[in-house]
Amino acid sequence: MLTPSATVIFFRDAVRVLAPLLFVFVAFTAQAAPAGLDGRLIVGYQGWFGCPGDDGENKQWQHWFDGPAAPASLTVEILPSLREFKTTDLCDTGLKRRDGSAVYVFSSQNPRVVARHFEWMRAQSIDGVAFQRFVSHTQHADLRKRSDNVLRHVRASAEQTGRVFYVTYDVSGTDEATVVGAIRADWKYLTGEMKITQSAAYLSDRGKPVLQLWGFGFKDHPGTPEAATALIADLKAGTAGLAKATVVGGVPTGWRTLSSDSRSEPGWAAAYRSYDVISPWAVGRFADDQGADRFRRDVIEPDIAETRRLHIGYMPVVFPGFSWRNLMARRGQPDKAILNQIPRRCGDFLWHQVTNAAGSGATALFAAMFDEVDEGTALFPLETGADRSPAGTTMLSLGQDGCQLPDGWYLGIAGKAARLLHERRGPVKR
């Protein structure tokens, strides 16, 4: 087994060697994606970034700043490396780096931006994305339009690059009285009007398109166990006017015992166990290798035993690190505004989780997240040094913790994780 230091050296050299090939365009003819979650690395894809004027109507920065573009209103923790983009495809913030160069960001509304993201995934053999669709956004015409646009870009890019995609409904911030009804209505819209599951790239599993429900059962999220169970049942069976789906549950880590981050009402035990696949949210649940090892012992291994008993799938979550100083500072929560709260440690933290999960018998992984710079979990290319941050800001870079890494380092680790799963691809013994 590679030591942590050897792991760093291995990936650094591999990324440097492969870098010239990273963006080579290879034309793909869209064809049906191989079925099944087993043997896949799926990355979460927010697709929520925006710039004023990016869709002809938007007048605000979306997820880059809370207000005008200024150091004090910055809400992201680390900047993406955009050296492969033309400036005409980017947004000039008006800010300057410490060396005087302009700071650019991107809009997820730009199809060329999304296409490049998928080219990166293809170059590293990352299987595809779970596109995060916020249920609350589907209830507002302007926000739904933006989500629809990005979903179309995701579909086209996945088809072009031979990647897969599926939709994740995130219930965060949705009213409990409307959340289930909104999911029902939007799934009808996506499968009916948008015909999203007819894409050759839309992932299927067990003969049905994959759909994830994320957030039911968390202590601070909406939904009742009865309503969630009924929704899951209708989706699995294709009843109540809903298109059939294989339903993945993005659940609390305490789902099995109704403890920790899970609600404790008895009805949640049956709700969780009615999913086709369980994917417990692990981000922030531990901060170092020792914590990850305890998580493997206390959560992953018992979870796998339980899901095998239930004859359902299991897809653990891995993440590179965590930090949300700027976001929490803007929200007026200084006690949570901690820079580099969970250090990435040059990639060793992420790789340790990957080997833990695979060593426990997991055959699919969810990596959080491809583009989440708000909470510092992004896997796509990132700025490598503090000198690349806007003047007057406090931000992370890949140079944190004394690391000397290329900007695509974490794509390389994700690709290595994907290839590890591909080598083990096959039916799970349940």
Language model regions located:
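Bacterial N-terminal signal peptides
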Residues: 14-27
